[in-house]
Amino acid sequence: MIPSKGKYYFTSESVTEGHPDKVADQISDAVLDVLLAQDPNSRVACETLVTTGMAVIAGEITTRGYADLPHVVRETIRNIGYNSSEMGFDWQTCAVISSIDKQSADIAQGVDRATNEDQGAGDQGMMFGFACDETATLMPAPIYWAHQLSQRLTEVRKDGTVDIFRPDGKTQVSFEYVDGKPVRINNVVVSTQHKDSASQADIIDAVKTHVIRPILEPSGFFDEKACDIFINTTGRFVIGGPMGDCGLTGRKIIQDTYGGMGHHGGGAFSGKDASKVDRSGAYMARYIAKNVVASGLAPKCEVQIAYCIGVAEPVSVLVSSQGTASVPDEVLTRAVREVFDLRPFHITRRLDLLRPIYGKTSCYGHFGRELPEFTWEHTDAAADLRTAAKV
């Protein structure tokens, strides 16, 4: 339980698109997008494993579309930047192994219904959404700024600003909080893969000059003299990506969401179409939580939605302000149930989730980035919530 009073520290991490687990996530979502572009009703559960010189694709897919899996895999790896055997992973030469089956008929009969509105949930489980007023995008400050650093690491590598970085990297930001509010950045950790010829001094200078200062100085939370900065603290990070660690789809679920602030139901997102409530339910929960905060009903909101496989209506819904709202949680929950239809078909329709948009979600967070495709980041329901709550 995060305290609401006194001084404490909270930390969140992010990784770059070259991190092996994120390579896997991007491949899984690339396969999903290729199929949705041809058949919006594709049922996709695509898992990826990447290791030295190899990618393995497995899962269950039912679709009228076609995906050239070796091409999809290699294009994804090329776009990330693994273009040399020296990195242990080269898009031109890596092996691609696939084992794809159709969706289980037993699962399909629980999802498919005579009328679309009665579409059942694709699985049981609980999903969480979270929002707070710590940043303009209504995300917790630690994960928001950690993602900003990771994105910057990739940006300066790809645009040529820094020529010694390689694709793999991680960032971490620790905030000091006082009475539940972020007041300053206490420490920053950055690890970036680099060329063998790069010196530690050059790496530290490049990270501070081109990554940390441009991102964190405008934040209002960063004073370099009062902040501990840790950069490549092993002294060497040449071996990275899938050569350094095996990567798997769905192993970065905390940095995909809220950086540990708020709960997580355990289900991963990448490689799954919208009939999987692990993904669509979590997106809807974020949409609800963000609209509650945007409405002014609470400065902090967490939403839990739970489903039973084959059943359209959720088995439970909880909306909590964690004691920050002027109205009871019961009132918030009732308002949410009045404004939002939480059956899977209606979630998919409201958020327009049958589009090939998921490649953009697979790195730097599924939430808190207000891209045109990210409908779950819209705050168009805020006024309706205020009306339903009668405030």
Curated annotation (Swiss-Prot):
Residues noted as binding L-methionine in the record, renumbered to the chain: E60, Q103, D245, K276
Positions binding ATP in this chain are H19, D168, G169, K170, R236, F237, D245, R251, K252, A268, K272
EC number(s) on file: 2.5.1.6
Spans annotated as Flexible loop? 103-113
- Subcellular localization, per the record? Cytoplasm
GO MF, one term, reads:
magnesium ion binding
Similarity comment text for this entry? Belongs to the AdoMet synthase family.
Q: Which protein, by its recorded name, is this?
A: S-adenosylmethionine synthase
Lineage, uppermost ranks:
Bacteria, Pseudomonadati, Thermodesulfobacteriota, Desulfovibrionia, Desulfovibrionales
Gene encoding this chain?
metK
